[in-house]
Swiss-Prot record:
EC number(s) from the headed UniProt entry: 1.14.-.-
Family: Belongs to the cytochrome P450 family.
Organism: Arabidopsis thaliana (Mouse-ear cress)
UniProt GO molecular function: heme binding; iron ion binding; monooxygenase activity; oxidoreductase activity, acting on paired donors, with incorporation or reduction of molecular oxygen
Record has DNA damage as a keyword: no
Gene: CYP71B24
EC top class named in words: oxidoreductase
Alphabetical list of Gene3D superfamilies matching this protein: Cytochrome P450 (1.10.630.10)
Name the record gives this protein: Cytochrome P450 71B24
PANTHER family linked: CYTOCHROME P450 71A9-LIKE ISOFORM X1, CYTOCHROME P450 FAMILY 71 PROTEIN
Cofactors: heme
Localization annotation: Membrane
Topology of this chain in the membrane: Single-pass membrane protein
Keyword Iron: yes
Spans through the membrane: 1-21
């Protein structure tokens, strides 16, 4: 009898809450279970689960994850309202257990709460690293690292052996960013090497964005994280990341300005110099934690997005021979035979179809399928629904880029769709948002595009590509969490063109 009364009381509470929610004009929501909310519906890849739920319940969707309210936006129109009309009201970030620990309570650019500190950090990072002038100044690094990659691929081509192009492209982008941002090669530091950094990136990815402590505040969430080993793992990864960052900064502190090599002064030298010259009365003071946060943002975000974009582009080209032939014909016709076979960044400007291939890849395979979460700072209205203050907003750009309302045959890889099409990836067109929009748009767009375009140009100019004989078809299955990579590494056989 008591159990029956308990369930009647519980059912009554659910009905009362549902009536209250309907009176508040909240977005539609799938059936929620007590305590866990909608967690039971989120199996598999997170962005695809949200895509499927949005198709069923609408492009503005309210989910309850434990005790956490989250609104998922999956349409162009809703995204424009959130990121343009209400940009200021929802441009802060939620603080989670993982981001609080790994990013030192938001001392970086990507995950910092909105305020003066964020504005100053974005201004500094743009001035010292992301401006058009700065990006151009790093072109020789991009060209040199691509030449090294081509040299290694030629050795594999002569042996007629396959290469792990996923690993190759992560290595390429990692080397470019490490030299550009930190002024040294992987092999120049005693404490820094490509394998160690790749392992750390993988560990950070595995931790995910949310923990049980975020979903179930109080003792329950903490206890589950403690028993599962999540807290211990989080602390271990933080110590490893922090130790690596300390080594990178110490390497710069040991070198005086007179000893700086041709790759320097880099962003770390510049920011360390600013820290030394700060005065007591300055309204904003740059800290070592800010410096560490900027380093993490540049490397972790920069390597993932650029490498993943090139991997998906090459996979789609191999899967679509018509597009592969068209882009290679353009490249080889426009560039011709190069002296010493060295590609220069100026060559990219001639290649309009290559640029369309990059656009189409960013539409179909945004490296981060969900924009970093925002949090509302006041109540706003999206598509007629009330979104309360302190609600997490997730924009599903993977879903938006495949919306049949705005894209004909959205699952098809067709770069021609962008001919005479004003839609771009710079945050002004809400039909595709691979880098976000508004005050929290990714500051590294110019650097990423320069890296991707030159990398693809080198791969497509010097080599033809085919699947290894043992592979009959290309597996395009996705994997990942914050960023989405091919589940099966991209292994191809390079064939020398000349």
């Amino acid at each position: 009898m008591s159990i029956l009364l308990y369930f009647i009381a519980l059912l009554s509470l659910i009905i009362i809450k549902k009536i209250k929610d309907s009176n508040r004009n909240l977005p539609p929501s799938p059936l929620k279970l007590p305590v866990i909310g909608n967690l039971y519906q989120l199996r598999g890849l997170f962005h695809k689960c949200l895509h499927d739920l949005s198709k069923k319940h609408g492009p503005v969707l309210l989910l309850r994850l434990g005790f956490l309210d989250m609104v998922v936006i999956s349409s162009t129109e809703a995204a424009e309202e959130a990121l343009k009309v209400h940009d200021l009201e929802c441009c802060t970030r939620p603080i989670t257990n993982v981001t609080s620990k790994l990013w030192r309570d938001g001392q970086d650019i990507g995950l910092a709460p909105y305020g003066e500190s964020l504005r100053e950090l974005r201004k500094l990072s743009f001035l010292k690293f992301f401006s058009t002038t700065k990006v151009r100044s790093f072109r020789y690094i991009r060209e040199e690292e691509n030449d090294l990659m081509v040299k290694k691929l030629k050795e594999a081509a002569l042996k007629k052996s396959s290469v792990d192009l996923s690993q190759t492209l992560f290595g390429l982008v990692g080397s470019i960013i490490f030299r550009s941002a930190f002024g040294q090669r992987f092999d120049e530091g005693n404490h820094v090497n490509a394998e160690k950094i790749e392992d750390l990136m993988f560990e950070v990815q595995k931790l995910g964005a949310l923990s049980n402590s975020d979903l179930f505040p109080g003792g329950l969430g903490w206890f589950v994280d403690f028993v599962s080993g999540h807290n211990k793992k989080l602390h271990k990864v933080f110590v490893e990341v922090d130790t690596l960052l300390n080594h990178i900064i110490d390497d710069h502190l040991k070198n005086s300005i007179e000893e700086i090599t041709h790759d320097r002064p880099d962003i770390i030298d510049s920011l360390l110099d600013m820290i030394r010259k700060q005065e007591q009365g300055d309204s904003f003071k740059l800290t070592i934690d800010n410096l560490k946060g900027i380093i993490q943002d540049i490397y972790l975000a920069g390597v993932d997005t650029s490498a993943i974009t090139m991997i998906w582009a090459m996979a789609e080209l191999v899967k679509n021979p018509r597009v592969m032939k068209k882009v290679q014909d353009e490249i080889r016709t426009c560039i011709g035979i190069k002296q010493n076979e060295k590609i220069e960044e100026d060559d990219v400007d001639k290649l309009q179809y290559l640029k369309l291939v990059v656009k189409e890849t960013l539409r179909l395979h945004p490296a981060a399928p969900l924009l970093l979460p925002r949090e509302t700072m006041s109540q706003i209205k999206i598509q007629g629904y009330n979104i309360p203050s302190k609600t997490i907003l997730l924009v599903n750009v993977w879903s938006i880029g495949r919306d049949p309302k705005h894209w004909k045959n959205p699952e098809e890889f067709n770069p021609e769709r962008f001919i005479d099409c004003p839609i771009d990836y710079k945050g002004n067109s809400f039909e595709m948002l691979p880098f976000g929009s508004g005050r929290r748009i990714c500051p590294g767009i110019a650097f990423a595009i320069a890296t991707v375009e030159l990398g693809l140009l080198n791969l497509l100019y010097h080599f033809d590509w085919r699947l290894p004989e043992e592979d009959k078809d290309l597996d395009m299955e996705e994997a990942g969490d914050v960023t989405i990579i091919k589940k099966v590494p991209l292994k191809l056989v390079p064939v020398l063109h000349h």
